[in-house]
């Protein structure tokens, strides 16, 4: 059985799925109220949380428009932006002693990966049509189609593994790193490790967001749109 560090969720249950679900919901609630606070009293000259959120949104759209174009970057921002923010908050909550990152659970990162996987295929089929979308899987050379098509299918399914395990592995490793540091220096606040984990939390949220846009671009942009 996997050893788990004691968290506040253990006051209610020691079940693995319950603990993961507890922090998934807690993170969503925290994100909702923080986001609500940032947008509750909008000002022409942004200050405080509003300024932070507007800077984040501008940064995401600035990067995304280079991948998929400004119009589509804004269209798919509700998905990519929400996932980026949620992954960030999920990563950050695990830094707090007594809390656990939902993204340190592979079952949760798998759900996020599946959401992206099914959504970009849905959008690709909706925009291009079923047959035209899957015709791209066969490649430009017809006689290579029997070889290219299964390779493309495997490649797309491997994205689920790549997305979920990359996030899970990095955050799980970060949590173990923090635990070891706290055990080694329990009498002092390890500021440097906390800064490293904060940076890694931002980086993993950024990578997940970028890959979401990349997969969407590959699905909805035709050859003429590139």
Swiss-Prot record:
UniProt similarity note: Belongs to the ATPase A chain family.
InterPro entries named among the record's database cross-references: ATP_syn_F0_a_bact/chloroplast, ATP_synth_F0_asu, ATP_synth_F0_asu_AS, F0_ATP_A_sf
Role this protein plays: Key component of the proton channel; it plays a direct role in the translocation of protons across the membrane.
Gene Ontology biological process terms, A to Z: proton motive force-driven plasma membrane ATP synthesis
HAMAP family membership: ATP_synth_a_bact
One CC-aspect GO term: proton-transporting ATP synthase complex
GO molecular function, one term: proton-transporting ATP synthase activity, rotational mechanism
Record's subcellular location: Cell inner membrane
Superkingdom: Bacteria
Positions of transmembrane segments: 18-38, 79-99, 105-125, 134-154, 179-199, 201-221
Name listed for the protein in its UniProt record: ATP synthase subunit a
Bilayer disposition of the protein: Multi-pass membrane protein
Assembly mode: F-type ATPases have 2 components, CF(1) - the catalytic core - and CF(0) - the membrane proton channel. CF(1) has five subunits: alpha(3), beta(3), gamma(1), delta(1), epsilon(1). CF(0) has three main subunits: a(1), b(2) and c(9-12). The alpha and beta chains form an alternating ring which encloses part of the gamma chain. CF(1) is attached to CF(0) by a central stalk formed by the gamma and epsilon chains, while a peripheral stalk is formed by the delta and b chains.
PROSITE patterns reported for this sequence: ATPASE_A
Sorted UniProt keywords: ATP synthesis, Cell inner membrane, Cell membrane, CF(0), Hydrogen ion transport, Ion transport, Membrane, Transmembrane, Transmembrane helix, Transport
Organism phylogeny: Bacteria, Pseudomonadati, Campylobacterota, Epsilonproteobacteria, Campylobacterales
């Amino acid at each position: 059985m996997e050893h788990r560090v004691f968290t506040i969720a253990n006051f209610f249950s020691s079940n693995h799925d319950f603990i993961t679900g507890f922090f998934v919901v807690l993170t969503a609630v925290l994100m909702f109220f923080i986001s609500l606070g940032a947008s509750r009293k909008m000002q022409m000259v942004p200050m405080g949380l509003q300024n932070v959120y507007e800077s984040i949104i501008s940064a995401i759209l600035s990067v995304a428009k280079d991948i998929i174009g400004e119009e589509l970057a804004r269209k798919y921002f509700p998905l990519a932006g929400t996932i980026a923010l949620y992954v960030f908050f999920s990563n950050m909550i695990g830094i707090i002693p007594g809390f656990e990152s939902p993204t340190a659970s592979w079952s949760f990162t798998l759900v996020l990966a599946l959401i992206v996987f099914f959504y970009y295929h849905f959008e690709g089929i909706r925009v291009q049509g079923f047959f035209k979308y899957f015709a791209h899987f066969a490649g430009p050379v017809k006689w290579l189609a029997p070889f290219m098509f299964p390779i493309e299918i495997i490649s797309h399914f491997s994205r689920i593994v790549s997305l979920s395990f990359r996030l899970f592995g990095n955050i799980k490793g970060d949590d173990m790193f923090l635990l070891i540091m706290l055990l080694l220096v329990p009498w002092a606040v390890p500021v440097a490790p906390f800064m490293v984990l904060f940076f890694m939390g931002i980086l993993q949220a950024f990578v997940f967001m970028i890959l979401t846009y990349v997969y969407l671009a590959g699905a909805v942009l035709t050859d003429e749109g590139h």
